[in-house]
Amino acid sequence: MGELKLINIDKETNYDEWLAFRTNGLGASDIGTLMGLNPYKSKIELFYQKLGLIPIKQDENIPMFYGNRLEEFVANMWEYYDGEDPESVIRNYAAGTKIRICKPITGYITNSDYPHLFLSPDRVMVSKETDKIVYGGKLVNKNFTGVLEVKTINGFASKQWEGGIPPSYVTQLQTYLFGLELEYGEIVFLEDGRKLWTIPMELNLNLRDKIVSEMNEFMHRIDAAKADIENVQMYEPEPDGTEAFEKFLNTKYADSESKTLQGSDDMFQIAVRHKVLAGEIKEMESQHRECSNLLKNHMKEHESLD
């Protein structure tokens, strides 16, 4: 077992120290990006942020703004939720009956077994209200029984994900579990501002190993790039198939020049495959559109087939 430590850095009063700490490691919320699961941010963007070559975005969007301010409320309501019936929150809250207990931790947690990782879970679970989680500036992690991650979610948007949640939420919670050396955690959701539900999760050792492998490989790139910053492009993560990676490259190379690059055999094969796939996609889209039109023409004003 690794040694867990609590590190307190006040972003508001010591921004430079906070920024240096953040850029020298990975947080649990970075893991989805690292694994190619974040539709809004690419691994290559994370790479340049950790090198300090592009800024870490600090501006809150509307979901982040309300999510941050609702975190305490949702965590408090989780304590009254029986895990099955959303209306149990109302009954237990009215009766003053807490089903389980969670507590916030101020600061970042590090684990000596994972030196590149820093953790800031929304809440940790404890058995009793009187259980301390920090004493004398040190963690009392023997009292941790689980970890709780709090999310607000739009019901319509959640339908695009298998299981109703973005896969990056899963990797985030799993990272908290192995980083805090816990076996159990939950994600609690407030859906559309009115429905509370949870997804319980146990530590997945296979996923842990994949995450740790990706972390180590990524941080090796970071360390190598810092030592050879003039040749930073040599250490960039390899392109993947995510739209976020495509968007980053389009922005980076927006100002192209009318020059020809001598290609290799590998690049030629990639270009051929790109052309073949583009043709297949176009044909599939045409077939999909034809099927859609046939169905619409057959069903007319009806909404479903029996």
Where are these regions (language model features)?
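Accessory terminal regions of nucleic-acid processing enzymes
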Residues: 1-306
